[in-house]
Amino acid sequence: MVYIKSCKGLYKNEKTKMPASDLVLEPVKEVIKGMDALDIDGIICATITKDYVYPSASCMLGGKIKAKNAFCYDIESDFTGFISALRLAYSFVESKRYKNVLAVSSESFYICDDKDRFNDASVAALITSEKSNIQIDFIDSTTDGSALENCYIPMGGAVKPYTREGIINKEHFIYIKDNKIFEEEAKKSALYVKETLSKNNIEIDYYIPSYFNKESFDNFANSLSVDKNKIYSKMENSNSSLSATSGVAFSMALEDGSIKNNSKVALCGFGSGYTKALAVFSVS
């Protein structure tokens, strides 16, 4: 069995201009409290706003907490980043070669201009073989990969390197064609969640969706076709935090008592790419 020993999120409701590895430092210190950092086997960081092109944000984080025995690498999976990090950490621990792996996500939105609807946030979870009250039962994800032009950063990669003109035109910032694309993706994500749960014979007591805007949240909730009291809604008006989104919502639901004991919880993520992800936990 694989467990989440502790999960802590941080939602800033602003752009902090903090490096990603600094932004997630507080949640990480909270989830490893009382633990020797040398016992951390790995750090997986989901982010598209890492401190440097290289080294990785996870490497920077590992240095700050002195996790000298840990492997470290970053992943990019947009809005489903935290669940993707969980999936990898789960696999490492399930292999029984590793006992403690940090799955973190941190987004610091220096790559946005002010009109974009994003706020800084971070989340950390300690994935472990040590029995805890949150058991990871199931994780799945899928990617379409055909929607590049709808939400991406146009400049800065091999296809379009940095240019003076491009920077003036803000092509190094996140580009979103239309917020309505996420409203439609929310419907598709709800269908994916229902089909995946049905196929695997999983019954859910409580759903925690990622958030982008109120409209996309409502579309997800309505398309899921379950009692609205079974859906965590306290983040529905919050700005998105990309890969940290679902993890922050999960952490808040744990802290505010929305998740009841002896319940089966579905953490749902969706976004650009297009990516969809689902994690199921038993909370005792």
Which stretches of residues belong to each language-model region?
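Membrane helical hairpin/interfacial module
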Residues: 41-59
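A short, Trp-centered hydrophobic/proline-enriched beta-strand micro-motif
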Residues: 73-75
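Short, glycine/acidic-enriched capping/hinge loops at junctions between secondary-structure elements
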Residues: 13-15, 54-57, 220, 278
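Conserved beta-strand-centric core segments of catalytic alpha/beta enzyme folds
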Residues: 1-18, 86-149, 249-284
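Surface-exposed loop/turn positions
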Residues: 41, 70-71, 122, 263
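Claisen-condensing/thiolase-fold acyl-transfer catalytic domains that form or cleave C-C bonds
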Residues: 21, 25-28, 49-51, 63, ...
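Conserved "HGTGT" condensation-loop signature of ketosynthase/thiolase-family condensing enzymes
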Residues: 1-44, 65, 69, 132-239, ...
